[in-house]
């Protein structure tokens, strides 16, 4: 029983609140239920520390509700909007417009997901004790992880 508990404790589901670098997490939440769980986990991880969110989404999801939930959570101090390299992506400008509707926090947009990731890392280094979260799509998680594995 002890070995089973230890194995469960050490199990990591790739792309689900996965810490890919110190204080940098990727989560493939891509619907309102997933975003709700993501927000709970992000809040638990960062506590009162500042959090930066990198976000993208595909156009056939309930993206406006997801964006509203993220903005209303009060967890994130900065938002980075990126466009994924999939035909299903929602244009970055559209995502940015929706975030602007729900929050006055700083918004920065990138055409390339990994450029946004690098900017997020830079912000995380500049903002003391901050955490970077990347979410909105499993495609996004995959793009970032692939670039990291390939050494960009």
Predicted feature residues:
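Nucleotide phosphate-binding/pyrophosphate-handling subdomain across enzymes
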Residues: 1-78
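C-terminal helical cap/extension that packs against the catalytic core
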Residues: 24, 67-131
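Short, active-site-adjacent cap segments at secondary-structure transitions
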Residues: 140-142
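Glycine-rich, phosphate-binding/catalytic loops in enzymes
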Residues: 42, 70-71, 98, 150-152
């Amino acid at each position: 029983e002890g070995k089973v508990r230890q194995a469960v404790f050490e199990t990591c589901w790739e792309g689900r609140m996965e810490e890919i670098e110190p204080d940098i997490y990727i989560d493939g939440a891509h619907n309102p239920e997933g975003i709700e769980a993501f927000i709970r986990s992000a809040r638990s991880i960062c506590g009162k520390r500042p959090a930066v969110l990198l976000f993208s989404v595909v156009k056939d999801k309930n993206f406006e509700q997801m964006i509203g939930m993220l903005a209303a959570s009060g967890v994130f101090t900065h938002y980075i909007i990126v466009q994924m390299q999939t035909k299903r992506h929602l244009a970055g400008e559209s995502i940015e417009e929706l975030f602007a509707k729900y929050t006055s926090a700083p918004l920065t947009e990138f055409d390339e997901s990994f450029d946004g990731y690098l900017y997020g890392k830079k912000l995380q280094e500049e903002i003391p004790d901050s955490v970077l979260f990347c979410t909105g799509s499993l495609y996004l998680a995959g793009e970032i992880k692939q670039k990291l594995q390939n050494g960009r």
